[in-house]
Regions:
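Active-site-adjacent substrate/metal-binding segments within catalytic domains
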Residues: 22-101
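Active-site region of glycoside hydrolase catalytic domains
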Residues: 2-44, 88-89, 98-480
């Protein structure tokens, strides 16, 4: 047996979000997914939308007790803009929502769970999209800052750990490039402006936080989905493609958030292509002077890039980042076949080393990492528990590489699994389950999976023992 131990104050937890768990109960405003489901239910797996989700709005006390049983010492969730704010222009609050979030935060604390709060998790109020164009319009940035300010004033007495956005690049790519989030546009120039506006919104929220924060332990950051980009080969065209993919997918928000400036090479490329965002010197100064205190990193799978399918100078298509790179599926890659994602735990080590080397070893944590599997009922044992050994193996492998990085000086301070309880996952709905806790979406019955008991033991020991069987599997290529 090989034993690996993590730091004493390590965050062992899970991540989720308001729109994926709460349900639409007593919400005055719809977010973009509420609206999308109303208008286009056929886009969602089995036409299951966010109306009920996992019923956290009604069941949060019982749900949090289950999270405690799973050993979580910290949980990241989000406050829904569309729930908390009554008047989106004025930024006034809905008292029922204030009472709800106060009760949730208090319940976490009463159960020994650290509440980690994110402000924006893909859930823009749809009225702001239809009236102003959403994140394409800088007026919406100001409304977001009003929302953020209300959150800080209402909850910072008990919440020390804040994040501005979850995966802003997904908002850019899903809504404005690749049509997997509403409004389903394909507009490269607009996508670039949305990326800039999201970053400016984050920086302004950070500025506001530091202006009004009275909590001596208060810190604020951003959660980014970071996946190393590996070239398909050592051919110079593939190496160049992977480099530009990394500039766009990772360095854009990472550099602006941590270093206070956008990557010079990317700015030059976007300027050359005549799609550069509209900015002012004053805005760029705000970004420069309001860097994150810490970083959340979501990692699920690596990215692999090859030279583009068409000439970068082609006029046959409007501007897309894909004019510089194409995705590549490596032959023989180890796959989660249910999700279609490659499993490559070593990339987490490489992310850690990149942060250590190129981003001043800023404090960070794994804010999401998880494995989505469909039809988990096939793994039910005779006692009605899902024996998700595949998830345990997945967690162990990623922790092995994360521990290696920490031993080498990485400033990682936590690991949050996606997710605590099986949750609504946008247009995939409940197709792939990620939780330590299963949910019957018809009865809302919730049950600990085998992985929940594993995770509790992990938390209690702040480490784990890895068997010879683990290393046998670890060194083989196989499919879950």
């Amino acid at each position: 047996m090989t034993k690996i131990i993590f730091p004493k104050e390590f965050w062992w937890g899970a991540a989720t979000s308001g729109p994926q768990t709460e349900g639409r109960f007593k919400k005055k405003h719809a977010n973009i997914f509420d609206y999308d489901f109303e208008k286009n239910p056929e886009r969602f797996w089995h036409e299951i939308g966010p109306d009920m989700a996992s019923n956290f709005y009604n069941d949060f006390r019982e749900d949090i007790k289950l999270m405690k049983k799973a050993g979580l010492n910290s949980v990241r969730t989000s406050i829904q803009w569309s729930r908390l704010i009554d008047d989106l222009e004025e930024g006034t609050v809905n008292q029922d929502a204030v009472d709800f979030y106060n009760a949730v935060i208090d319940e976490f604390i009463a159960n020994g769970i650290r509440p980690v709060i994110n402000l924006h998790h893909f859930d823009l109020p749809v009225d702001l999209l239809h009236k102003y164009g959403g994140w394409t319009n800088k007026h919406v940035i100001g409304l977001y800052v009003k929302f953020a300010e209300q959150c800080f004033k209402l909850f910072s007495d008990r919440v020390s750990d804040w994040f501005t956005h979850n995966e802003p690049m997904v908002v850019v790519e899903g809504g404005y490039l690749y049509q997997f989030h509403y409004p389903d546009l394909v507009d490269g120039k607009l996508a670039v402006q949305v990326a800039y506006n999201l970053q400016l919104a984050s920086s302004l929220a950070i500025q506001k936080f530091h202006e009004i924060n009275q909590n001596p332990n208060g810190k604020i950051g951003i959660v980014l989905n970071l996946s190393p980009n590996y070239p398909a080969s050592q051919a110079k065209e593939d190496i160049a493609a992977a480099h530009i993919a990394d500039l766009w997918q990772n360095q854009l928000f990472m550099d602006a958030s941590v270093k206070g400036e956008f990557p010079k090479e990317l700015v030059e490329l976007l300027t050359k292509d005549k799609v550069i965002w509209e900015s002012t010197k004053e805005e760029l100064a705000i970004i420069k002077n309001n860097k994150v205190d810490r970083l959340g990193v979501n990692y699920y799978h690596p990215n692999r890039a090859q030279k583009p399918y068409y000439s970068p100078n082609s006029l046959a298509v409007d501007w897309l980042p894909n004019k510089y790179f194409a995705n590549y599926q490596m032959h023989g890659a180890r796959m989660n076949v249910d999700k279609g994602w490659e499993i490559y735990p070593r990339a987490l080590y490489e992310i850690a080393k990149n942060i250590q080397k190129n981003y001043n070893n800023i404090p960070w944590f794994v804010s999401e990492c998880g494995m989505g599997v469909s039809n988990e009922e096939r793994y039910l044992n005779e006692d009605g528990q899902i024996d998700d050994d595949y998830r345990i193996q997945f967690i162990q492998e990623h922790l092995y590489w994360l521990h290696q990085a920490i031993e080498e000086g990485s400033s990682c301070f936590g690991f949050h699994l996606w997710t605590a309880i099986d949750c609504f996952s946008w247009r995939n709905s409940y197709r792939n389950r990620y939780g330590l806790i299963s949910v019957n979406i018809h009865t809302q019955e919730k049950t600990l999976k085998k992985s929940a008991h594993f995770f509790k033991n992990l938390t209690e020991n702040s480490g784990l023992e890895l068997s010879e069987e683990f290393f046998d599997k670890f060194n083989k290529t196989f499919r879950f």
